[in-house]
Amino acid sequence: MSNPGGRRNGPVKLRLTVLCAKNLVKKDFFRLPDPFAKVVVDGSGQCHSTDTVKNTLDPKWNQHYDLYIGKSDSVTISVWNHKKIHKKQGAGFLGCVRLLSNAINRLKDTGYQRLDLCKLGPNDNDTVRGQIVVSLQSRDRIGTGGQVVDCSRLFDNDLPDGWEERRTASGRIQYLNHITRTTQWERPTRPASEYSSPGRPLSCFVDENTPISGTNGATCGQSSDPRLAERRVRSQRHRNYMSRTHLHTPPDLPEGYEQRTTQQGQVYFLHTQTGVSTWHDPRVPRDLSNINCEELGPLPPGWEIRNTATGRVYFVDHNNRTTQFTDPRLSANLHLVLNRQNQLKDQQQQQVVSLCPDDTECLTVPRYKRDLVQKLKILRQELSQQQPQAGHCRIEVSREEIFEESYRQVMKMRPKDLWKRLMIKFRGEEGLDYGGVAREWLYLLSHEMLNPYYGLFQYSRDDIYTLQINPDSAVNPEHLSYFHFVGRIMGMAVFHGHYIDGGFTLPFYKQLLGKSITLDDMELVDPDLHNSLVWILENDITGVLDHTFCVEHNAYGEIIQHELKPNGKSIPVNEENKKEYVRLYVNWRFLRGIEAQFLALQKGFNEVIPQHLLKTFDEKELELIICGLGKIDVNDWKVNTRLKHCTPDSNIVKWFWKAVEFFDEERRARLLQFVTGSSRVPLQGFKALQGAAGPRLFTIHQIDACTNNLPKAHTCFNRIDIPPYESYEKLYEKLLTAIEETCGFAVE
């Protein structure tokens, strides 16, 4: 009988599984790499390569190889870009890990491990970023069925809810609790909400050696479809962003109040602590209830004014079948009314003689100041006077290279050429641009130029589709020219009455208007940081914080320290200087390394839209002007839809609206983009949709065509042609296929 121990001196058979890589470096501005992994047992001649995954920074391979490893052998796993490897020696290198014999023994039979990619040599100039996930198993321990592992869980979901893994400047791993706003060295095992630490800001950390970060495969056995997970995250981001782009969003109720409705549909407000209820909206000061109704402008769509038997005025909301005593126009414009009221009080204090004999008229905001639609109308009139009467701004691009080709053509033009009538053509397509092609061009282009993959912008938060300028955009040496281009495109969208599909943080629009940034602006962008800074201001931090006037910044995996003031690293934050610290921190947070980028973007925007034309708008209004309404009001859509060769009782019409109501916000936006060329709604609602020759309503057209055909859109006329499908299920299937799988223009 052979002795098993005698095999220790010979090669050992191990199975290496290369599962996936994450966050690879992006070296081309307009293209993503085609990564593949190469496995080499150094000096033995054993060499294997995975399949190539197209156009991604997060490739997933899940391929295994049986290797014979000697006692002193090492294994090198390298990642390469297949697009570049044929150009020259060493081209296309994206990073590698080298496993020496002691590391192989340590990693063997421990499940999947996440390893940081490194350079080939310490003197190499290649930029490397990202991680690779691998496992090493003894060959005699492998069963017949391999475990399916979801790669995304190895990176994103291996911590309990509410926790995040970060690294200090020295590289040590720390764990951030977003619920209690505390940090710790030990890896958490329970959700963040179960930890009861006193609320305090993040602490600084001392330098220590970085421990090896491992992820056991057994903990990741519950697989889920990464595409579904990605779609859920994307949909949540989309919903969060859309919830911000209403035309008039009433402010939140005061703390302790709830809005409720009686069985008869009457809206009232309950103070939960005292149990007292009232018909009056607590958000609206009672001294504003006597404002002249005519000065407030028209009621929102679907509302009506009525009187009770005693003559008291109330308001009927036919959209929700409710009634209330508070004027809905006051809730919508409350911040403007109060601002105007404060301005008038200041003026009255400075003037000996009152210029306004009627207090009621004084409290009323002038319509041109309050009514966004009216202000937008004035802006359009002023812009139309700048548009040349002759000539066109002609741009021809391909869908595949829309960003690069648009950039080259737009940047060659003079600013006044961008004011000419916009005429867009997609190469190889016969569509004539009466507005619809331009809307689609802006829709597609905004998706490309605002994509964080290109490095110009980054998401301000993980849970919402709002963008901010990437302080590390300088990895592209021409980045300032691209920001200049983005500003021009935003200006062109506003000038020609179109919209950008995407949005920035509200402080960005505030800066675009030339206004200063405050701590309050931080709340929407980074609520955790905002809470931490507020905590610092409101509490005695003596002996609690070990902050200095130096902050850390993660630049593509590298921790960079920034001093908020000269020699800030050696200046501790205390009770005396904490206000200065917060002020400098806020200023750094919004302007860190982006001054040049923002000025380039602002220059491009103001070349098309002079800044003095925007002085009557605030940042929320500017966002709506640039991006339009994100929230789609289905009732408004129905009311402002024209029917052609069909009636409201036609099955096609009823089934169409049934499908629309079943769609989530993202698919409704895609349907709107399919028919009109834009996923955004004008500020005035669907009644203001523009066609080839002015306003043109959304149109449902039932056509006599084969029911195997897909619905067809005419973006210049906001019309969708629908064959007479036999069932709702078939219409739903065909409509879904059309909005998600088709593109291109033609001439009939």
Curated annotation (Swiss-Prot):
UniProt-annotated catalytic positions: 716
Tissue specificity of this protein: Widely expressed.
Description of activity control: Activated by NDFIP1- and NDFIP2-binding.
Cellular compartment(s): Nucleus; Cytoplasm; Cell membrane; Membrane raft
Stated consequence of mutating residue 547 to F/I: Activates autocatalytic activity
Consequence of changing residue 716 to A: Loss of catalytic activity. Increases SMAD7-bound TGF-beta receptors in membrane rafts. Decreases interaction with TTC3. Decreased VP40 virus-like particle budding
Record text on subunit structure and interactions: Interacts (via WW domains) with SMAD1. Interacts (via WW domains) with SMAD2 (via PY-motif). Interacts (via WW domains) with SMAD3 (via PY-motif). Interacts with SMAD6. Interacts with SMAD7 (via PY-motif) and TGFBR1; SMAD7 recruits SMURF2 to the TGF-beta receptor and regulates its degradation. Does not interact with SMAD4; SMAD4 lacks a PY-motif. Interacts with AIMP1. Interacts with SNON. Interacts with STAMBP and RNF11. May interact with NDFIP1 and NDFIP2; this interaction induces the E3 ubiquitin-protein ligase activity. Interacts with TTC3. (Microbial infection) Interacts (via WW domains) with EBOV and MARV VP40 (via PPXY motif); the interaction facilitates VP40 virus-like particle budding.
Protein name stated in the entry: E3 ubiquitin-protein ligase SMURF2
Gene name as annotated: SMURF2
